Amino acid sequence: MTACQSISTAQTTVSNKITGLFGYNEKLPEIDPKGIVDISKATIEQYEQLSANLPLNQWVYLENEKQGIYQLQNKSTEGFVLSLRLNCKISSHPPTFELQDVQGKRILYGYDKEAGQIQFLLDNKNYGNPFDPFQRQTLSRFQQQLASAKVIKLFHASKLYRFQNQNAELLSKPVSCRENS
């Protein structure tokens, strides 16, 4: 161990002890083996830390019963996050999706006529944008195939985003869908 590594380790240990004194070093909510995590008791800092450290290439269901918020997220190897909102808790809200970059900034969402062409591919079969409100029959076929697909790809503006479809059984869980999202 070098002197720099020793100082770094000591600094981390001291920092953790100090933040622990003020209650900032609380344990993060844990994701169960099924891919579900209860975030209702998490602080904003814990939620941000959990989001930054989501397991890669699988669906994770985040539930917050206190606030009535339920999310389904999949983080790619590159750090992009895909949120699918297929089974909306409030049936009047349309199904939608959101794609975030590594910093958590929204890149794409649902049906955005300003965004240009969006294509979803399930195991390399193209479904176009199944969230287009004028193509609802495509959404139904997309949902059926999604349950058994191995890989989800999203193509937009000459960029391909790739997500593994592990824990696909979570896709049937009800989620919070916001209108105009």
Give each language-model segment a name.
Residues 1-2:
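Bacterial N-terminal signal peptides
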Residues 5-181:
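A generic "folded-domain core" signal
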